[in-house]
């Protein structure tokens, strides 16, 4: 410590017998004291515990350094605060470097701090523990904040020093495992400005948008090599820890060696023991992925083949259990063919009979006979000279003309209606044959000048015949036959049983009626004597 001498020592000397002692003003004594203190303590280092720390709106910081016996007021000007590598906190033991100055307005003295550092590793550990607990209480280290890393990031952002083995190890390991595009944000990783620079880099990566000139990374790696606690201290700073916790991109922290742990590791989504390990955690091994895909492809093909084979076997089993469609429909097809043939024969017979009747009546309605009869009647009427008779003849002739006209219209209507009915039946039952026969009938009718009364009667008869044929066709339907009391016999496999011999070979038979089915068991009837004179079966009447 520098020695000093007080020029105003005569102030302390006893006054002599005379009264010529000089009187100093307060300002003079305060100024003399200020010069003495500032000259004697212009550069000193003071160790103590911080208390009463506050930061004014101007940026200046005010605090006090204390020990067990004394308290020293101190101040840190705004320009010095930005150069301090940590945030001062109450209870922190520090070593302050600066100068003493006095404040004459209140007869106080204070230490103007120009440099501030933590006093020893123990104090650093205590500060680290307090900071860790504070940030943990805020939830920055909660497990639910951790995000899963992307499986195969296309772009990886690295925040580290551009020079050194760290970035080389990361790039080399990524190239070996799975080549990936890497963007390096160069920052200092040690010193007073390291924490702020690294935090700015993390926030800069998070601020990138899709489509920017610099592509947005899918994953961030904050990396630094090993070192002492003081060397790694920037990664314990609150500004950096908060930047990592608030990052919108998943972050891997790879600071120091495996035994080194920083607050950045707690805030990151994943901690890697070394920068090389961070590269291994960031990307998978490409060769392992290829082998895995090949294995999955092989397993998928085998599974598809097994499933196809199993489905084919099941389909074949179902096909064997299903009855044959042709065998199911054979009885109905045969019955339909029989009924169709019978209906065709019946229609042919009816048409032949109708043709004979038509020829018979057509012979009686010859135009020559009609003309001769009309001539005779006209001659007879002409012979009558009575005016009244002539008027009657004229009136009757008019009535006859009206009736004739109406009969012609009715004849045409009935003929059209019959034509439609015949066309409908022709479409159902051999259209070509019916059309030929109908054409013959039409030509024959057109060749004859028929009486309207006879034509109308014939048309009525034909209409009845057609209606009767239609009813016969309906009665020939299989469902109509069942409704009359008949039943269709089938075995357990839905096969038709058509004789008694086959029925005896089955244990159960299915009797199908028009309104349902009944399962029965055939039994052998007891032997009985034949009737001497069995009744003859009644003659089957024709529906036609």
UniProtKB/Swiss-Prot annotation:
Q: What is this protein called?
A: Exodeoxyribonuclease 7 large subunit
Q: Coiled-coil annotation: which residues?
A: none
Q: Which InterPro entries match?
A: Exonuc_VII_L, Exonuc_VII_lsu_C, OB-fold_nuc-bd_dom
What is annotated about its quaternary structure and interactions?
Heterooligomer composed of large and small subunits.
> What CDD domains does the annotation carry?
ExoVII_LU_OBF
Q: What does this protein do?
A: Bidirectionally degrades single-stranded DNA into large acid-insoluble oligonucleotides, which are then degraded further into small acid-soluble oligonucleotides.
> In the record, what terms sit under GO molecular function?
exodeoxyribonuclease VII activity; nucleic acid binding
- Species, as recorded: Zymomonas mobilis subsp. mobilis (strain ATCC 31821 / ZM4 / CP4)
Gene encoding this polypeptide? Answer: xseA
């Amino acid at each position: 410590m520098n020695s000093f001498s007080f020029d105003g020592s005569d102030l302390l000397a006893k006054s002599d017998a005379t009264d010529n002692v000089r009187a100093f003003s307060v300002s003079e004594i305060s100024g003399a004291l200020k010069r003495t203190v500032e000259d004697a303590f212009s550069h000193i280092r003071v160790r103590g515990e911080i208390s009463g720390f506050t930061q004014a709106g101007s940026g200046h910081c005010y605090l006090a350094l204390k020990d067990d016996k004394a308290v020293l007021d101190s101040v840190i000007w705004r320009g010095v605060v930005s150069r301090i590598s940590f945030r001062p906190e109450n209870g922190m033991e520090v070593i302050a470097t600066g100068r003493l100055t006095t404040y004459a307005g209140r007869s106080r003295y204070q230490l103007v701090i120009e440099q501030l550092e933590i006093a020893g590793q123990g104090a650093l550990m205590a500060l680290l523990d307090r900071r860790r607990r504070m940030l943990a209480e805020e939830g920055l280290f909660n497990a639910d904040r951790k995000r899963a890393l992307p499986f195969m990031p296309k772009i990886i952002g690295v925040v580290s020093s551009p020079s050194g083995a760290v970035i080389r190890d990361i790039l080399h390991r990524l190239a070996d495992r799975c080549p990936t595009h890497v963007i390096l944000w160069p920052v200092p990783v040690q010193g007073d400005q390291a924490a702020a620079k690294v935090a700015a880099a993390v926030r800069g990566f998070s601020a990138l948008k899709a489509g920017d000139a610099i592509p947005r990374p899918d994953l961030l790696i904050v990396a630094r090599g090993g070192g002492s606690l003081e060397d790694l201290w920037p990664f314990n700073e609150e500004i950096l820890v908060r930047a990592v916790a608030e990052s919108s991109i998943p972050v891997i922290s790879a600071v120091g060696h495996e035994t080194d742990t920083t607050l950045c590791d707690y805030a990151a989504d994943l901690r890697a023991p070394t920068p090389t390990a961070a590269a291994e955690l960031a990307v998978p091994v490409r060769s392992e992925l290829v082998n895995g895909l090949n294995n999955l492809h092989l397993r998928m093909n085998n599974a598809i083949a097994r499933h196809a084979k199993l489905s084919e076997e099941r389909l074949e089993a179902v096909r064997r259990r299903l009855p044959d469609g042709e065998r199911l429909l054979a009885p109905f097809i045969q019955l339909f063919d029989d009924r169709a043939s019978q209906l065709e024969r019946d229609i042919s017979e009816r048409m032949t009979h109708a043709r004979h009747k038509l020829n018979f009546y057509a012979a009686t309605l010859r135009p020559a006979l009609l003309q001769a009869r009309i001539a005779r009647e006209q001659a007879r009427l002409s012979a009558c000279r009575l005016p009244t008779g002539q008027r009657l003849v004229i009136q009757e002739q008019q009535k006859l003309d009206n009736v004739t006209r109406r009969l012609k219209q009715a004849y045409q209507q009935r003929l059209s209606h019959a034509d439609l009915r015949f066309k409908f039946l022709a479409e159902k039952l051999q259209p070509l044959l019916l059309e030929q026969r109908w054409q013959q009938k039409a030509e024959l009718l057109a060749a004859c000048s028929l009486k309207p009364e006879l034509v109308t009667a014939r048309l009525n008869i034909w209409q009845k015949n057609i209606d009767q044929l239609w009813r016969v066709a309906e009665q020939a339907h299989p469902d109509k036959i069942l409704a009359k009391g008949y039943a269709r016999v089938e075995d357990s496999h839905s096969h038709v049983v058509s004789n008694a011999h086959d029925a005896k070979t089955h244990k159960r038979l299915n009797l199908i009626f028009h309104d349902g089915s009944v399962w029965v068991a055939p039994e052998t009837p007891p032997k009985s004597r034949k009737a001497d004179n069995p009744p003859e079966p009644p003659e089957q009447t024709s529906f036609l």
